[in-house]
């Protein structure tokens, strides 16, 4: 089955699962097919998935991940390497910290962090470019199902400042660590700052418990959760450094992954 046939098959099979989508017109253009498939994956509720569908999905997603360019840990310089390159002194835990700008789903590290919502099932908005949607879309339908199985045992929504870990499925990382950061609805408060620190700490703790040696953090809560970027970066770095004071031997590398230029500038100023 070629790529175009795989797209048609997956759209057809996902359409059959939901009566509302059974009569969807399948586009001729492969890019339009791919957009439709992502939308159908995004809105699919958790539930049993046929092995045949998963096999075709995986055959589609894995080449897409490779085509984006998988980034190995060895390709990302540490803070100290960066500082040395520009003639600066070593920084606190600079041999274990990195700043990297780009798509977190490209990173071949032990675990990446997903900024989730309290349902912990991924983003259901078709084609939305939040990190929750991007990670779930690249990992595959298995990720939502894995999250659902954990949430089903919990019988409640996920509290702010905690973390859960799942396999990463079609991503180049081994695991995804999911955390719900605080939502800033009005002004920033000490309680919200503590909640964000708790999210970072919970991710670090669950990473250690699962022998994760290389971990990439996204910018938790700075998107639709409206946490101020500067304050969030300062909390992220301070929390990670404080954790390394007691657990430095547990990690080979912790990466602060940013996507926006403004976040890159903020982290660079704080780290470099």
Name each model feature, range by range.
Residues 1-272:
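Macrodomain-like recognition of ADP-ribose-binding/processing modules
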């Amino acid at each position: 089955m070629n790529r175009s046939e795989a797209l048609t098959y997956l759209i057809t099979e996902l359409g059959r699962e939901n009566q509302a989508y059974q009569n969807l017109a399948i586009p001729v253009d492969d890019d339009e097919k791919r957009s439709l498939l992502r939308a159908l994956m995004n809105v699919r509720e958790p539930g049993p998935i046929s092995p045949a569908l998963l096999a075709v999905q995986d055959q589609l997603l894995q080449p897409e991940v490779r085509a984006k360019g998988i980034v190995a840990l060895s390709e990302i310089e540490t803070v100290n390497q960066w500082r040395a390159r520009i003639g600066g002194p070593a920084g606190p835990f600079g041999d274990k910290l990195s700043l990297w700008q780009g798509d977190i789903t490209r990173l071949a590290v032990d675990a990446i962090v997903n900024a989730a919502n309290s349902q912990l099932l991924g983003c259901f908005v078709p084609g939305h470019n939040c990190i929750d949607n991007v990670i779930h879309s690249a990992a595959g339908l298995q990720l939502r199902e894995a999250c659902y199985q954990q949430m089903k045992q919990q019988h409640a929504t996920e509290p702010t400042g905690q973390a859960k870990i799942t396999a990463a499925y079609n991503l180049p990382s081994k695991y995804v660590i999911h955390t719900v950061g605080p939502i800033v609805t009005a002004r920033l408060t000490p309680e919200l700052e503590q909640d964000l620190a708790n999210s970072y700490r919970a991710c670090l703790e669950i990473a250690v418990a699962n022998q994760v040696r290389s971990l990439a953090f996204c910018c938790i809560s700075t998107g639709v959760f409206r946490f101020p970027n500067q304050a969030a970066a300062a909390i992220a770095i301070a929390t990670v450094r404080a954790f390394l004071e007691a657990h430095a031997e547990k990690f080979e590398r912790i990466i602060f992954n940013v996507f926006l230029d403004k976040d890159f500038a903020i982290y660079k100023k704080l780290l470099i």
